[in-house]
Amino acid sequence: MDLVKILPIDLVYIILNYLCYPQPKELQKDIISYVDTMYQTCNIYYKKWIIEMGQIGEDINWLENDLILYANEGVPTMLGIQPKLKKIFTRFCIADKVDFYVFDMNNKLSVKTRINMLLGLFTKEEREEFITIVIAIVDR
């Protein structure tokens, strides 16, 4: 049976688009890094907060908190936005609007969306460093 014949036409067009116009290798590597990091961190936080601590739903809250703390150089955002967090957010928006996005996104986006956004803005090296720190802390 020809599988293409049973796929919705919209999906066929999407697949053909990727076959004709493949993504750059660097972008593919970044996407793989993002997916791997997301899987690892969600797994670690789920085991710690849901399995060990029994606190349903707290895993994603702590993950977001730790991502922001890492990006803000260990300083709570209420004490100010550090240069590293500003640099990360300038990958997404104009430098003079960083403060607005950092604080405004808390009111308008879900926790999962904020986590996806932060991890997506991190470079591959920043994701690897974050995972290394998280594993070191959890294994204590």
Predicted regions and their residues:
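Short hydrophobic alpha-helical "box" of cullin-RING ligase substrate receptors
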Residues: L7-L19
